[in-house]
């Protein structure tokens, strides 16, 4: 069943700041997420309860976009960041959880 995507201002701002190639890669995965209702590794990973990240790699740079499920048909895209270390930064996870609480 197709899911409705909703974007927070933080997610929209992050996406518009990225190059066309990064935007294209994210929107391809977001379309698949909307159409299928879920993404699996390596395209996405569960970070915390009801918090997932979409993973994109373009020209050796890694980008992440957090999302969550709010109801049966809704997916909220919360925030994004450029990944610079092996581990997802705790401050980015806390930020996404804080944003998620605002849309729940």
Language-model features: locations:
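Hydrophobic/aromatic beta-strand elements that line small-molecule binding cavities or substrate pockets
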Residues: 65-66
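Basic, Lys/Arg-enriched alpha-helical interface segments
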Residues: 1-62, 71-75, 82-104
């Amino acid at each position: 069943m197709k899911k409705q995507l909703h974007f927070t201002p933080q997610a929209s701002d992050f996406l518009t700041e990225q190059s066309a190639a990064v935007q294209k890669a994210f929107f391809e995965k977001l379309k698949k997420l909307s159409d299928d209702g879920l993404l699996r590794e390596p395209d996405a990973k569960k970070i915390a309860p009801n918090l997932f990240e979409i993973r994109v790699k373009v020209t050796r740079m890694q980008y992440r976009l957090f999302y969550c499920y709010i109801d049966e048909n809704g997916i909220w895209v919360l925030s994004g960041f450029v990944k610079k270390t092996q581990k997802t930064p705790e401050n980015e996870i806390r930020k996404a959880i804080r944003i998620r609480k605002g849309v729940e």
